[in-house]
Amino acid sequence: SSEKIADDLDAALSEVSSAQHNLEGRLRVASLSGSFADQVVGPAMNEMAALHPNVEIVIDFNARQVDILSEGYDFAIRAGPMQDSGLIARPLTSRTRVAAASPEYLASNGKPLHPAELKDHQCILTHSNKWRFTEKGKLLDVAVTGRLNLNSGQAILDGCSRGLGIAYMAIGGFGKTLSDGTLTPILNDFWHTDRSIHILRPDRRYTPRRVEVAISILEAFAERARAHEIQTIRALL
């Protein structure tokens, strides 16, 4: 339940904060941008700042792949497959990708019932022209096309809401548009979930306590956000 989630978060935060009032120094983090950054990373690091007033926090919200070691970051938050970089990769959370379109788009273009039918639709792309779905427990990669290619979740959401095509992105990026009827979820049986967000940090013998505490807070916020996502998904299915 949402009450249990809130209680668990409070317990986790009190645990990481109780003995840590003397933390100090600088915390430097590189984070992916987008809905996860806005809904989880930013609030978690603001919580860190509120709990530990002697810690200076610098967060770089950026899509580029930083060099953690040479650029002096304590850790990075990244999505997608992890390359073997000599860094420690720690899974942070899973994400479920959801396909959706506006009622107007579906009325004009029809509603695809299988991912293979997306070849006949305008898909709003980001980075890749392949979308990954799951069919009966197996991965299904589908080539898609579209005249919009956007690397901003907000821009994708706006274009989708205006009937310009089908969006397929992490459920957190849709905000309230799925529950309030602005957008209609489609291909519900094929949505793909992967453990795609990781914390990357240097492989050091000694990790400063402020870094360990920041990661603990981040994990608590990510767990709460994921639990809310699962509730939202269940309500849509």
What is the meaning of each model-derived region?
Residues 119-140:
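Secondary-structure junction motif
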Residues 86-97, 101-124:
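Flexible hinge/capping segments at coil-to-helix
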Residues 89-92, 145, 181-192:
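Short beta-strand->loop
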